[in-house]
């Protein structure tokens, strides 16, 4: 159950391996959180010129991923993830998904720690779903039911999952029998304030004041179903906060697109206060420590030479400026005035960063 990135990827591969598959999706369309994500996919091709140039490798990806999670991850699972990541990219390309050429598209995604992110040609996560749905629409024995909320995992007398109970669009009961098992791919719960607050062990507050980048359907339905069966959960308190986005809505819309290497974070005093290429939790904690937990993201015309370049939501930098969601200036002094920060500290921050 679940028609997001994980659910549809599982459905496609299960069908490729010979299984008859039905995906249940409670929303009116597929996509989940994946379609709202930036779309970048971290993977190392050991033989590529880019990986060699950046001194990257699968083992380095493994080391960074394990240490970046404070060694709480299962080493075997982490190694499985990173060692199969490039095969995953190739699998997606075989399905028809397009990625930018590595020389133009390999970059460091926020919190990614190294330039190994592959950027799709299509915006956000739309490229994934075009590939998945093109496959599903052109193959037998794999279907998607929309507006169908899974409510219970059915088990046989031996405790094996044998189907799913669901509620259809009109409130009707839908029973699906499964001979080979049930894949639960509907566990995201960032849009469920009660659930995330209950599991939270890391942050001071994850209540209503903290908005979510997730879609409205990320309410942890799969977790609730598995709880009824006595499933064992691990590390549920490791909830990620992203140091970006609209604090009023949580949306990433309105952000000027930027690479880790070409931006600096500036607080209300005009100071750069954190390594923008670091871990997401480190950046978020640093942001919370600033006045009003407020920052500007500063970049120059090397990133936006004309102002007509579009972000993942189709918005140009000029449009964001016109809407009052961004400012631009020809000099740092003028920019400081528009940001309402001291010019001398902003100039010092920019000149201190530029040699890097």
Listing of model-derived features with the role each one plays in the protein:
Residues 219, 223-225, 231-341, 345:
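An anion/pyrophosphate-binding glycine-rich loop and adjacent beta-alpha core
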Residues 1-23:
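N-terminal Rossmann-like FAD-binding beta1-loop-alpha1 element of flavoenzymes
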Residues 6, 29, 271:
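Conserved Rossmann-like nucleotide-cofactor binding loop
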């Amino acid at each position: 159950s679940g028609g997001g990135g994980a659910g549809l990827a599982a459905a496609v591969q299960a069908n490729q391996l010979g299984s008859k598959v039905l995906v249940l999706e409670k929303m009116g369309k597929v996509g989940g959180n994946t379609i709202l994500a930036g779309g970048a996919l971290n993977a190392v091709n050991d033989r590529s010129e880019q990986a060699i140039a950046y001194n990257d490798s699968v083992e380095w990806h493994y080391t960074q991923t394990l240490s970046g999670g404070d060694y709480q991850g299962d080493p075997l699972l982490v190694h499985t993830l990173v060692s199969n990541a490039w095969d995953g990219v190739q699998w997606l390309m075989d399905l028809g998904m397009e990625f930018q050429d590595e020389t133009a598209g390999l970059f460091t995604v926020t919190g990614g720690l190294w330039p190994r992110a592959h950027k799709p040609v299509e915006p956000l996560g739309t490229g994934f779903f075009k590939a998945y749905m093109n496959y599903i629409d052109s193959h037998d024995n794999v279907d998607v039911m929309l507006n169908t909320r899974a409510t219970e995992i059915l088990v046989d007398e031996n405790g094996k999952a044998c189907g799913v109970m669901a509620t259809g669009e009109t409130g009707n009961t839908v029973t699906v029998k499964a001979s080979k098992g049930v894949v639960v791919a509907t566990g995201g719960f960032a849009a469920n304030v009660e659930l995330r607050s209950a599991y939270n062990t890391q942050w001071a507050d994850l209540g209503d004041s903290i908005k979510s980048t997730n879609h409205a359907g990320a309410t942890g339905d799969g977790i609730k179903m598995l709880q009824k069966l006595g499933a064992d959960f691990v590390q549920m308190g490791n909830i990620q906060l992203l140091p970006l986005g609209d604090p009023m809505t949580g949306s990433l819309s309105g952000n000027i697109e930027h690479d880790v290497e070409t931006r600096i974070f500036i607080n209300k005093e005009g100071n750069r206060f954190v390594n923008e290429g670091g871990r997401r939790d480190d950046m978020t904690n640093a942001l919370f420590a600033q006045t009003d937990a407020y920052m500007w993201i500063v970049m120059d015309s090397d990133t936006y030479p004309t102002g007509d370049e579009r972000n993942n939501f189709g918005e140009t930098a000029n449009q964001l400026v016109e809407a009052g969601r961004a400012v631009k200036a020809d000099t740092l002094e003028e920019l400081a005035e528009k940001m309402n920060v001291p010019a001398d500290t902003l100039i010092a921050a920019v000149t201190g960063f530029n040699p890097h």
